UniProtKB/Swiss-Prot annotation:
Residues 562-621 form the KH domain. The lineage of its organism: Bacteria, Bacillati, Cyanobacteriota, Cyanophyceae, Synechococcales. Residues 631-699 form the S1 motif domain. GO terms for molecular function: 3'-5'-RNA exonuclease activity; magnesium ion binding; polyribonucleotide nucleotidyltransferase activity; RNA binding. Involved in mRNA degradation. Catalyzes the phosphorolysis of single-stranded polyribonucleotides processively in the 3'- to 5'-direction. Belongs to the polyribonucleotide nucleotidyltransferase family. This is Polyribonucleotide nucleotidyltransferase. InterPro entries: ExoRNase_PH_dom1, ExoRNase_PH_dom2, ExoRNase_PH_dom2_sf, KH_dom, KH_dom_type_1, KH_dom_type_1_sf, NA-bd_OB-fold, PNPase.
Length: 721
């Protein structure tokens, strides 16, 4: 079980790829390691199913908490449903891998990446992507690789290759770029309002590093004696495509050239052409090759018709510079935006529509205890900004059962979330946990960017003080030989014909999120740069329309949103506020009808629907944590009496005791002879004993209405509220 290990010196670190040692029955396997992070990646191929017209590729990323030396917190103490982060890494693997398989491949493929050990200095996701390529090549699956991925961070003015988790949090950029020898094949990024030029420079920087990992994979293949060969595509029967081109090209072209029609009208006309063609084919002789082709495969006609429509649409764009709705290549569809469309029971709402894409977003403000706890390998323990994306069937005029979110919904929600995070206010100025839900009411392309715009509207309507509003646009690119056309704001019918689709979100200052996917084996960085730059005018145009609906965040919150007060106490006094068994903090919350959260750092957040109640709770906590000094004078009420003395609340929540001997200069037989519960008295702190107990005295302290002529000037009194 020795296997072979190849080490690569990579930006001052060593990346190790071990092959031939693990998972011997998998088609191909590699253990890819850097530091103490180890990811086992396997690729397996099985015979394809008959009658399918797509590539059945499954990419899985498995997290095991033993990788971080932890035991799962579930009842069964084992991993259950993959966390959201694992789903996003599945997509990160799938997106650069899928376009690199031959279009004719129909075999079942499964890539499984398992994080076996995690070093907080080395995130596992980009290692898993590179490992997926290596395992696929070792499995001898037809594949236009090698492919590799790296992460690029930005600390100050310097790019950092494969930064640690801590560096990612501190930096202004978190960008993953995947590439092949042909060029860039995938980009995923979150940025702190970075100019387009900086993001493009980072992509170029990352692609140079990708090239080194590609060479390493090629070296491993050579040492293993594996020659990478892409089998020729199976012979395709051209009878039906040729027939459709002659019979339908003109009529399809006429429909595509009617720019004033609606999507429904265009779809109806194309369906009519296909139905008429199907009837014509059914009228042919049984022995006719066209009818034989259609009879042999029920999907042959719709697939060939769709392919012809795609070809004609691409030709119309490349030759005439016109799209199916008559727009120019750089033109955005009509936009409408509104804020506050729902009653204020909903804390904030926004409705955004671009063409037939319509998204309703809502914002809900919560307390720190509403933060999402992360039970995964991410060092971050919680999330305070959540974005959830829903895509019901009715949004595309279809029916299907309502199920839990799939990978697509999770991915789109995460992209829109990433776009907003850089402009959220600092926690110490706005301590709310915020959840935004984007409901896609109608979909005709670019719903994720519609969710970004809807989120901005809802957050501003909720009174969240965003640093800058964010908008987003979906772009497309068609490449035919050396000719390249970039499309702004692609709609649904265009999504399937472009060679690259990418989404860009940001403010007027710069980019906050970027997602770029290819359907070809790679593009030069120069073309990617052109696409990124063309998205900026579209984003700013959309942003201008949004600002017509709401120019700045509302000054006040919804009356139904909780009111929060946040302040800091000495962390060593947290136990004083909580009290034995939580008794003290429970009494405060019950007395003031508030909700109180205390962080380990000493930050206290009080939530209440009544601002006065929150202020009362704050005064109590400040009283509990305020340092009391000997000699200080306070005015307070008698709270209880015991045989040897009386207790006085000198500060909200903080009591001291007057011993019976300190009630008067004269001898006192019974405490009640001098004071009663509820009496207001002025006391001086006589001493604080070694257990922190406050001992008070009335002796020599003038009370209300008494002369203070012979008394020394008291120290400042801390009044009760």
């Amino acid at each position: 079980m020795q296997g072979q290990t190849q080490s690569i010196s990579f930006d001052g670190r060593e990346i190790r790829l071990t092959t031939g040692r693990y998972a011997p029955q998998a088609g191909g396997s590699v253990m890819i390691e850097c530091g103490d992070t180890s990811v086992l990646v396997t690729a397996t191929r099985s015979k394809g199913r008959d009658g399918i017209d797509f590539l059945p590729l499954i990419c899985d990323y498995e997290e095991r908490l033993y990788a971080a030396g932890r035991i799962p917190g579930s009842f069964m103490r084992r991993e259950s449903r993959p966390p959201e982060r694992a789903t996003l890494i599945c997509r990160l693997i799938d997106r650069p891998m899928r376009p690199l398989f031959p279009s004719w491949l129909r075999d079942d493929l499964q890539i499984v990446a398992t994080c076996m050990s995690l070093d907080e200095r080395v995130p596992a996701d980009v290692l898993a992507v590179t490992g997926a390529s290596m395992a696929t090549l070792l499995a001898k699956i037809p594949f236009y690789g090698p492919m590799a991925a790296v992460r690029v961070g930005l600390l100050g003015d310097d790019f950092v290759l494969n930064p640690s988790y801590r560096e990612i949090e501190r930096g202004d950029l978190d960008l993953v770029v995947a590439g092949t020898p042909q060029g860039v094949v995938m980009v995923e990024a979150g940025a702190n309002q970075l100019p387009e030029g900086d993001v493009i420079e980072a992509i170029d920087f990352g692609y140079e590093a990708v090239s080194e990992l590609i060479k390493a994979q090629q070296s491993i293949l050579k040492e293993a004696g594996i020659e990478q060969v892409i089998p020729e595509a199976p012979e395709q029967d051209k009878t039906l495509p040729v027939y459709l081109e002659k019979a339908c090209s003109k009529s399809i072209g006429e429909v595509l050239g009617q720019f004033e029609q609606t999507k429904a009208e265009r779809d109806e006309k194309l369906d009519a052409i296909r139905s008429t063609t199907a009837e014509t084919i059914q009228g042919l002789k049984d022995s006719d090759p066209v009818r034989v082709a259609v009879s042999a495969n029920g999907k042959a006609l719709p697939n060939s018709f769709k392919a012809l429509t795609k070809t004609l649409m691409r030709q119309q764009i490349l030759k005439d510079g016109k799209r199916v709705d008559g727009r120019n290549l750089d033109q955005v569809r009509p936009i409408s935006a509104a804020a506050g469309v729902l009653p204020k029971r909903v804390h904030g709402s926004g409705l955004f529509q671009r063409g037939l894409t319509q998204v309703l977003s809502t914002a809900t403000l919560g307390t720190p205890s509403d933060a999402q706890e992360m039970d995964d390998l991410n060092p971050s323990n919680e999330k305070t900004y959540l974005h959830h994306y829903n895509f019901p069937a009715y949004s595309v005029g279809e029916t299907r059962p309502m199920r839990s979110p799939g990978r697509r919904e999770i991915g789109h929600g995460a992209l829109a979330e990433r776009a907003i995070v850089p402009v959220l206010p600092a926690k110490d100025t706005f301590p709310y946990v915020v959840r935004v839900v984007s409901e896609v009411l109608s979909s005709n392309g670019s719903t994720s960017m519609g969710s970004v715009c809807g989120s901005t509207l809802a957050l501003m309507d909720a009174g969240v003080p965003l640093k800058s509003p964010v908008s987003g646009a979906a772009m497309g690119l068609i490449k035919e030989g050396d000719e390249v056309k970039i499309l702004t704001d692609i709609q649904g019918i265009e999504d399937f014909l472009v060679d690259m689709d990418f989404k860009v979100a940001g403010t007027d200052k710069g980019i906050t999120a970027l997602q770029m996917d290819m359907k070809i084996t790679g593009l030069p960085v120069s073309i990617v740069a052109d696409a990124v730059n063309q998205a900026r005018p579209a984003r700013l145009h959309i942003l201008e329309k949004m600002m017509e609906a709401i120019e700045s965040p509302r000054e006040g919150l919804s009356p139904h949103a909780p009111r929060l007060l946040s302040f800091r106490i000495d962390p060593e006094l947290i136990g004083t506020v909580i009290g034995p068994g939580g008794r003290t903090i429970k009494n405060i919350t019950e007395r003031t009808n508030t909700k109180i959260d205390i962080e380990d750092s000493g930050i206290v957040t009080i939530a209440s629907h009544d601002g006065a109640a929150a202020e009362e709770a704050q005064k109590i906590i400040e009283g509990l944590t305020r340092k009391v000094n000997e000699g200080e004078v306070f005015t307070g009420s008698i709270t209880r009496i015991i045989p040897i003395g009386a207790f006085v609340e000198i500060l909200p929540g903080k009591e001291g005791m007057i011993h019976i001997s300190q009630l008067s200069e004269a001898r006192v037989e019974k405490v009640e002879d001098v004071v009663k519960v509820g009496d207001e008295v002025t006391v001086r702190v006589r001493e604080i004993d070694n257990r922190g107990r406050i001992n008070l005295t009335l002796r020599g302290v003038p009370q209300s209405g008494e002369s203070a002529d012979s008394q020394p000037a008291p120290t400042p009194v801390a009044p009760l509220s």
